Every structure is written in structure tokens, then in C-alpha cells.
């Protein structure tokens, strides 16, 4: 049963302190709750901004593409060629195959080494149509035939700079040919050339099994011309 007696001054003063303490604690908890809510609000806002930034970047990436280019300079000749990033979709299997055979043919025909000349000679004959093969064989019967002109003392090295398949059985191959003494003495002499080549596949001719292994598709050069690149000293 409640005590009906009035509170003494000491009791009233004590109750005031207790109520003040309760109010202060409640105020502190309220401020903490408010601070926590503000912190969560800021965190969610920052997360939203980050998400929007990522979406914007992902949307803009397809619109801006950086394509690296590398300029390769041939030391001996100074010839420059652009090396681009390889993209498989930029080439068809037919284009790659044509470039392969074009570069193989030109390299074998234009280089010279006394120790491998017979191999290159046979290979060029194998990849040449009858008329081109006849002209090539005739060049080795002339007084200035490569084997008579250079003998064992000189080599001609070939570096392919580019190969372009123009379609319809025509391609061009740009290359550097460097002449050196076989013993490594003396200065090297380099020059740039462009070979224009007409070609076809599976020409009607008899090939042995060994020849078919070397030329399985019957690649044959039907016309061949090589010119020095203009503008050289």
C-alpha cells in the first residue's frame, strides 16, 4: 500500500537526480541511435554511388577502345612496318592459308645459301606452275645464275615484312633481302623488295606422295614478278 506521507526535501532532491540521470541516459541512447542511422544512410549512399559509377564505366567501355600499335624497324635497312594486335576475327582461314603459302614461296625463291640451295630450288619448282617453273629453271642455267654468282662465299637472307592477299588469286609480299659474306666479314647490304604473285590451288599435275606431303593443297604460282621498292637510295 502506498505511503501517503509527503516526501521530505531530501527525498525530493534524490528523485530529481534520478530522473535527470534517466533523462541523460535516454538522450545519450537517442543520439547514438541517430548517429547510427546517419552512418547507415551515408554507407548506403556511398554504395549506391559506387554501383552507379561501375555501371557507367561498364556502359562506356565499348565506346572507347585503345588499339596498341608497334612500329618495327629493320636495323640493317631502316624499313618500318606496323605490328598490330592480332584479332582472329580479322582473318579468314583462306586468307591465312594464302599468306602462308605466299610467304613460304617468296622466302624460298629469294634467299640464297650454298648449303641449302638444292632444297630451296626443289621446293620452288614444286610450288610453281609449268610456265613459272620453266622460267625459274632457266634462271639457273644463265651465266649469272645465283650459284655461279655467289658460290659458297655469299648468303642472301630474307625477312618478310608483310603479306597481303588481294583476293582472286593475287597477293603481294614485301620483304628485306640482306646480302652478307658467308664468313661474317664485311658490311651487310640490305634492300627492300615487293613480290607480286598470282597463284592457284590443285593445279592439274601429277605429284608423288612425298611431294603431296610438302604441298598438300596443290598450291602453284602462276605468275611471279619482283620489284625493288621505290624511294630507296
From Swiss-Prot:
Source domain of life: Bacteria
Effect in UniProt of substituting residue 10 to A: Strong reduction of PTX secretion. Even stronger reduction of PTX secretion
GO annotation, biological process: protein secretion by the type IV secretion system
Induction conditions: Cotranscribed with ptxABCDE. Activated by the two-component regulatory system BvgS/BvgA.
Topology within the bilayer: Single-pass membrane protein
Outcome following mutation: residue 19 to A: Strong reduction of PTX secretion. Slightly stronger reduction of PTX secretion
UniProt entry keywords in alphabetical sequence: Cell inner membrane, Cell membrane, Membrane, Transmembrane, Transmembrane helix, Transport
Regions that span the bilayer: 42-62
Gene Ontology CC, one term: plasma membrane
Localization, UniProt: Cell inner membrane
Pfam families: VirB8 (PF04335)
Function: Component of the type IV secretion system ptl required for secretion of assembled pertussis toxin (PTX) through the outer membrane. Could possess peptidoglycanase activity.
Family to which this protein belongs: Belongs to the virB8 family.
Designated name of the protein: Type IV secretion system protein PtlE
Organism, as annotated: Bordetella pertussis (strain Tohama I / ATCC BAA-589 / NCTC 13251)
Gene designation per UniProt: ptlE
Amino acid at each position: 500500500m502506498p505511503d501517503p506521507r509527503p516526501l521530505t526535501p531530501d527525498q525530493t532532491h534524490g528523485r530529481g537526480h534520478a530522473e535527470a540521470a534517466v533523462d541523460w541516459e535516454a538522450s545519450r541512447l537517442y543520439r547514438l541511435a541517430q548517429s547510427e542511422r546517419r552512418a547507415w544512410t551515408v554507407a548506403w549512399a556511398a554504395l549506391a554511388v559506387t554501383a552507379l559509377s561501375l555501371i557507367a564505366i561498364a556502359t562506356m567501355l565499348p565506346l572507347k577502345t585503345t588499339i596498341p600499335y608497334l612500329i618495327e624497324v629493320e636495323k640493317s635497312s631502316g624499313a618500318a612496318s606496323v605490328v598490330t594486335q592480332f584479332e582472329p576475327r580479322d582473318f579468314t582461314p583462306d586468307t591465312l592459308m594464302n599468306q602462308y603459302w605466299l610467304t613460304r614461296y617468296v622466302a624460298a625463291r629469294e634467299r640464297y645459301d650454298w648449303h641449302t640451295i638444292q632444297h630451296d630450288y626443289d621446293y620452288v619448282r614444286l610450288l610453281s606452275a609449268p610456265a613459272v617453273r620453266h622460267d625459274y629453271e632457266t634462271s639457273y642455267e644463265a651465266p649469272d645464275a645465283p650459284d655461279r654468282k655467289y658460290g659458297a662465299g655469299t648468303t642472301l637472307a630474307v625477312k618478310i615484312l608483310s603479306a597481303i592477299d588481294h583476293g582472286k588469286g593475287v597477293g603481294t609480299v614485301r620483304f628485306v633481302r640482306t646480302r652478307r659474306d658467308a664468313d661474317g666479314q664485311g658490311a651487310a647490304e640490305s634492300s627492300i623488295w615487293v613480290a607480286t604473285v598470282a597463284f592457284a590451288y590443285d593445279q592439274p599435275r601429277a605429284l608423288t606422295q612425298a611431294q603431296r606431303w610438302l604441298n598438300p593443297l596443290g598450291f602453284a604460282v602462276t605468275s611471279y614478278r619482283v620489284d625493288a621498292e621505290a624511294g630507296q637510295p
